[in-house]
Amino acid sequence: MRDVLREEKKFLINQAEALKLRNYLSNTIHTDPHNGTDGYPVRSLYFDSLSNRDFQEKEDGVELRRKLRLRVYSPDAEFALFEMKQKQGPYQRKRSLRLSRMEAQALIEGDYSVLLNSGSEFGQECYSIMEMWAYRPKTVVEYDRFAFIAPENSIRITFDSGIRANEVNFNIFDRNLVLNSVMSPFDVVLEVKYNGFLLSYIKHMLLPVQKSEISVSKYCMARQIGCDYRF
Protein backbone atom coordinates (compact mmCIF):
# COMPACT_ATOMS: atom_id res chain seq x y z
CA MET A 1 0.00 0.00 0.00
CA ARG A 2 1.31 3.42 -0.99
CA ASP A 3 0.48 6.48 1.11
CA VAL A 4 1.23 10.02 -0.13
CA LEU A 5 0.36 13.36 1.54
CA ARG A 6 1.04 16.56 -0.37
CA GLU A 7 -0.28 19.95 -1.37
CA GLU A 8 -1.90 20.33 -4.75
CA LYS A 9 -2.72 23.31 -6.98
CA LYS A 10 -4.85 23.14 -10.12
CA PHE A 11 -5.12 25.58 -13.00
CA LEU A 12 -7.33 25.67 -16.08
CA ILE A 13 -5.21 26.95 -18.96
CA ASN A 14 -5.35 26.97 -22.74
CA GLN A 15 -3.23 24.96 -25.17
CA ALA A 16 -0.93 27.90 -25.96
CA GLU A 17 -0.17 28.46 -22.27
CA ALA A 18 0.39 24.74 -21.80
CA LEU A 19 2.86 24.58 -24.69
CA LYS A 20 4.80 27.55 -23.33
CA LEU A 21 5.01 26.03 -19.84
CA ARG A 22 5.96 22.61 -21.18
CA ASN A 23 8.79 24.11 -23.22
CA TYR A 24 10.05 25.94 -20.14
CA LEU A 25 9.88 22.82 -17.97
CA SER A 26 11.59 20.67 -20.61
CA ASN A 27 14.69 22.82 -20.14
CA THR A 28 14.39 22.97 -16.36
CA ILE A 29 13.35 19.65 -14.79
CA HIS A 30 12.99 15.99 -15.76
CA THR A 31 10.16 14.56 -17.80
CA ASP A 32 8.32 11.56 -16.39
CA PRO A 33 9.93 8.38 -17.80
CA HIS A 34 6.44 7.09 -18.66
CA ASN A 35 5.73 10.00 -21.01
CA GLY A 36 6.99 8.54 -24.26
CA THR A 37 6.64 11.05 -27.10
CA ASP A 38 3.17 12.38 -26.40
CA GLY A 39 2.55 11.50 -22.76
CA TYR A 40 0.38 8.61 -21.60
CA PRO A 41 -3.33 7.83 -21.08
CA VAL A 42 -4.92 7.65 -17.63
CA ARG A 43 -8.22 5.79 -17.21
CA SER A 44 -10.15 5.67 -13.93
CA LEU A 45 -13.43 4.17 -12.75
CA TYR A 46 -14.97 6.24 -9.96
CA PHE A 47 -17.24 4.81 -7.29
CA ASP A 48 -19.77 6.77 -5.26
CA SER A 49 -22.68 6.11 -2.91
CA LEU A 50 -26.24 5.66 -4.16
CA SER A 51 -26.91 9.25 -3.07
CA ASN A 52 -23.72 10.52 -4.77
CA ARG A 53 -22.22 11.54 -1.45
CA ASP A 54 -18.68 12.23 -2.73
CA PHE A 55 -19.92 14.22 -5.72
CA GLN A 56 -22.22 16.33 -3.55
CA GLU A 57 -19.53 17.03 -0.95
CA LYS A 58 -17.19 18.27 -3.66
CA GLU A 59 -19.91 20.47 -5.15
CA ASP A 60 -20.74 21.86 -1.70
CA GLY A 61 -17.08 22.59 -0.92
CA VAL A 62 -16.90 20.31 2.12
CA GLU A 63 -13.38 20.66 3.52
CA LEU A 64 -12.87 16.99 4.42
CA ARG A 65 -13.96 14.75 1.57
CA ARG A 66 -12.88 11.72 -0.43
CA LYS A 67 -12.97 9.97 -3.79
CA LEU A 68 -12.64 6.25 -4.51
CA ARG A 69 -11.40 5.05 -7.88
CA LEU A 70 -9.87 2.16 -9.79
CA ARG A 71 -7.09 3.27 -12.15
CA VAL A 72 -5.21 1.75 -15.09
CA TYR A 73 -2.80 3.19 -17.64
CA SER A 74 -3.76 0.82 -20.44
CA PRO A 75 -6.77 -1.43 -21.12
CA ASP A 76 -4.23 -4.24 -21.55
CA ALA A 77 -2.76 -3.71 -18.07
CA GLU A 78 -2.24 -6.77 -15.91
CA PHE A 79 -2.92 -4.80 -12.73
CA ALA A 80 -4.91 -1.81 -11.50
CA LEU A 81 -4.59 0.61 -8.60
CA PHE A 82 -7.49 1.06 -6.21
CA GLU A 83 -7.11 4.53 -4.72
CA MET A 84 -8.67 6.75 -2.11
CA LYS A 85 -8.03 10.48 -2.37
CA GLN A 86 -8.89 12.53 0.70
CA LYS A 87 -9.00 16.30 0.89
CA GLN A 88 -7.64 17.45 4.25
CA GLY A 89 -7.51 21.24 4.31
CA PRO A 90 -4.69 22.33 1.96
CA TYR A 91 -3.44 18.74 1.66
CA GLN A 92 -4.39 15.80 -0.51
CA ARG A 93 -3.80 12.32 0.85
CA LYS A 94 -3.69 9.48 -1.66
CA ARG A 95 -3.53 5.84 -0.68
CA SER A 96 -3.18 3.11 -3.29
CA LEU A 97 -3.63 -0.65 -3.30
CA ARG A 98 -2.40 -2.75 -6.22
CA LEU A 99 -4.91 -5.30 -7.52
CA SER A 100 -4.50 -7.98 -10.17
CA ARG A 101 -6.51 -7.66 -13.37
CA MET A 102 -8.82 -10.45 -12.17
CA GLU A 103 -9.36 -8.73 -8.80
CA ALA A 104 -10.05 -5.43 -10.53
CA GLN A 105 -12.62 -7.04 -12.82
CA ALA A 106 -14.33 -8.58 -9.79
CA LEU A 107 -14.45 -5.15 -8.16
CA ILE A 108 -16.02 -3.64 -11.30
CA GLU A 109 -18.69 -6.33 -11.17
CA GLY A 110 -19.54 -5.49 -7.55
CA ASP A 111 -17.49 -8.05 -5.63
CA TYR A 112 -15.84 -5.84 -3.02
CA SER A 113 -14.54 -8.80 -1.04
CA VAL A 114 -11.27 -8.52 -2.99
CA LEU A 115 -10.56 -5.48 -0.80
CA LEU A 116 -11.46 -7.31 2.38
CA ASN A 117 -9.23 -10.22 1.39
CA SER A 118 -6.26 -8.06 0.42
CA GLY A 119 -4.62 -8.44 3.83
CA SER A 120 -4.32 -4.66 3.98
CA GLU A 121 -5.86 -2.40 6.63
CA PHE A 122 -6.45 0.13 3.88
CA GLY A 123 -8.29 -2.46 1.79
CA GLN A 124 -10.46 -3.37 4.77
CA GLU A 125 -11.21 0.31 5.41
CA CYS A 126 -12.30 0.79 1.79
CA TYR A 127 -14.44 -2.35 1.93
CA SER A 128 -16.24 -1.06 5.02
CA ILE A 129 -16.90 2.35 3.42
CA MET A 130 -18.17 0.87 0.16
CA GLU A 131 -20.49 -1.57 1.90
CA MET A 132 -21.74 0.89 4.54
CA TRP A 133 -22.57 3.63 2.02
CA ALA A 134 -23.59 1.29 -0.83
CA TYR A 135 -20.94 2.48 -3.27
CA ARG A 136 -21.43 1.64 -6.94
CA PRO A 137 -19.48 2.34 -10.15
CA LYS A 138 -20.53 5.75 -11.47
CA THR A 139 -18.32 6.88 -14.34
CA VAL A 140 -15.15 6.13 -16.28
CA VAL A 141 -12.85 9.10 -16.89
CA GLU A 142 -9.93 9.08 -19.32
CA TYR A 143 -7.47 11.77 -20.36
CA ASP A 144 -4.01 12.26 -21.82
CA ARG A 145 -1.26 13.24 -19.40
CA PHE A 146 2.21 14.71 -19.86
CA ALA A 147 4.20 14.90 -16.64
CA PHE A 148 7.35 16.46 -15.21
CA ILE A 149 9.11 15.60 -11.96
CA ALA A 150 11.68 17.19 -9.68
CA PRO A 151 13.23 15.38 -6.70
CA GLU A 152 13.16 18.49 -4.51
CA ASN A 153 10.06 18.34 -2.29
CA SER A 154 8.67 15.54 -4.50
CA ILE A 155 7.43 18.07 -7.05
CA ARG A 156 5.23 16.65 -9.80
CA ILE A 157 3.69 18.79 -12.55
CA THR A 158 1.12 17.34 -14.94
CA PHE A 159 -0.74 18.59 -18.01
CA ASP A 160 -4.06 16.77 -18.57
CA SER A 161 -6.02 17.23 -21.79
CA GLY A 162 -8.72 15.55 -23.84
CA ILE A 163 -10.78 14.70 -20.77
CA ARG A 164 -13.51 12.26 -21.77
CA ALA A 165 -15.95 9.99 -19.93
CA ASN A 166 -18.97 7.71 -19.94
CA GLU A 167 -21.53 6.73 -17.31
CA VAL A 168 -22.72 3.49 -18.94
CA ASN A 169 -19.89 1.01 -19.55
CA PHE A 170 -17.63 0.65 -16.51
CA ASN A 171 -15.18 -1.90 -17.94
CA ILE A 172 -11.88 -0.02 -17.86
CA PHE A 173 -10.24 -2.98 -19.63
CA ASP A 174 -12.41 -2.53 -22.73
CA ARG A 175 -10.19 -1.52 -25.66
CA ASN A 176 -13.20 -0.15 -27.54
CA LEU A 177 -14.71 1.83 -24.68
CA VAL A 178 -16.82 4.69 -26.05
CA LEU A 179 -16.02 7.99 -24.31
CA ASN A 180 -17.43 11.48 -24.79
CA SER A 181 -15.56 14.74 -24.33
CA VAL A 182 -16.44 16.65 -21.14
CA MET A 183 -14.05 19.57 -21.61
CA SER A 184 -13.14 21.93 -24.43
CA PRO A 185 -10.34 20.52 -26.63
CA PHE A 186 -8.62 23.89 -26.24
CA ASP A 187 -8.35 23.60 -22.45
CA VAL A 188 -5.74 21.86 -20.28
CA VAL A 189 -5.80 21.09 -16.56
CA LEU A 190 -2.42 21.90 -15.03
CA GLU A 191 -1.73 20.24 -11.67
CA VAL A 192 1.21 21.07 -9.41
CA LYS A 193 1.83 18.69 -6.51
CA TYR A 194 4.51 19.04 -3.86
CA ASN A 195 5.56 18.49 -0.26
CA GLY A 196 6.45 21.38 2.04
CA PHE A 197 6.85 24.33 -0.31
CA LEU A 198 7.26 25.16 -3.98
CA LEU A 199 10.71 26.10 -5.19
CA SER A 200 11.09 29.70 -6.36
CA TYR A 201 11.57 28.89 -10.05
CA ILE A 202 8.33 26.88 -10.07
CA LYS A 203 6.49 29.76 -8.38
CA HIS A 204 7.91 32.13 -11.00
CA MET A 205 6.74 29.84 -13.78
CA LEU A 206 3.19 29.85 -12.38
CA LEU A 207 2.87 33.64 -12.12
CA PRO A 208 1.25 34.08 -15.57
CA VAL A 209 -1.49 31.52 -14.74
CA GLN A 210 -2.16 32.35 -11.08
CA LYS A 211 -5.56 33.84 -11.95
CA SER A 212 -6.50 30.53 -13.57
CA GLU A 213 -6.24 28.54 -10.31
CA ILE A 214 -9.41 26.54 -9.74
CA SER A 215 -10.85 23.76 -7.63
CA VAL A 216 -11.69 21.33 -10.40
CA SER A 217 -12.59 17.66 -10.20
CA LYS A 218 -12.40 15.45 -13.27
CA TYR A 219 -14.93 13.17 -11.57
CA CYS A 220 -17.45 16.02 -11.24
CA MET A 221 -16.79 17.18 -14.79
CA ALA A 222 -17.53 13.65 -16.01
CA ARG A 223 -20.83 13.57 -14.15
CA GLN A 224 -22.10 16.91 -15.37
CA ILE A 225 -25.02 15.29 -17.22
CA GLY A 226 -26.03 12.59 -14.75
CA CYS A 227 -25.89 14.92 -11.75
CA ASP A 228 -26.85 18.14 -13.56
CA TYR A 229 -23.42 19.58 -12.74
CA ARG A 230 -22.20 22.54 -14.74
CA PHE A 231 -18.47 23.31 -14.93
PLM features: residue spans?
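Phosphate-end processing signature that detects enzymes handling 5′-triphosphorylated RNA
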Residues: M1-F231
